[in-house]
Amino acid sequence: MKKKFFLAGVILSALLLILVESNPNKRVRMKEVRQFTETMCRSDEHIKDLKFYFQRPGLRAEMVYEGPLEKEKLISITEDFKALVDVEFMQKIGDNYWGGARPSGFELYIYCDRDKEGNNYDYLIDSRYNKTYIVDENPDNIDGYKTWTISGAENEGVLYKD
């Protein structure tokens, strides 16, 4: 009888470990992120939700925004995120969530007037460490999260690039 309980416990523990480790998203819970999220939500009543996730090999944020988003507001949101996401910040993310490896990119998915469902986002704001998809430390290939792109969903293409 004891062997059956022990075996059931081992199997249950293994299943739990598989479920926990197979989740590709790890919720980011750092002081800087918490303060940034609180500031963003307080400064704009239309921001209903903002969460950050580490999703190897990058950092992902998801925002639920109530109401229409004009290009100027999208650029303003981008500027706010530019102030947070830099090489130093992304290295902290890597140190805390990926054994010291710096995330290769940042993506902000914005969902307007609805809860997020799958990848049915309305806007995507992103930035990368490297200029190309080749991940290396060649100085000619390093952008350091300085270039930001705003894209629309449904093949709308690039709306803004800074």
PLM-predicted stretches and their roles:
Residues 1-11:
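N-terminal Sec-pathway targeting helices
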Residues 9-19:
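Hydrophobic membrane-insertion alpha-helices, especially the h-region
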Residues 21-35:
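Bacterial Sec signal peptide processing site at the extreme N-terminus
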Residues 32-33, 37, 85-89:
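Hydrophobic face of amphipathic alpha-helices
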Residues 37-40, 80:
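Short amphipathic alpha-helical segments
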Residues 41-68:
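Short edge beta-strands and adjacent turn/loop segments
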Residues 62-120:
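Mature extracytoplasmic domains of secretory-pathway proteins
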Residues 94-162:
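Polar/charged, Gly/Pro-rich intrinsically disordered segments
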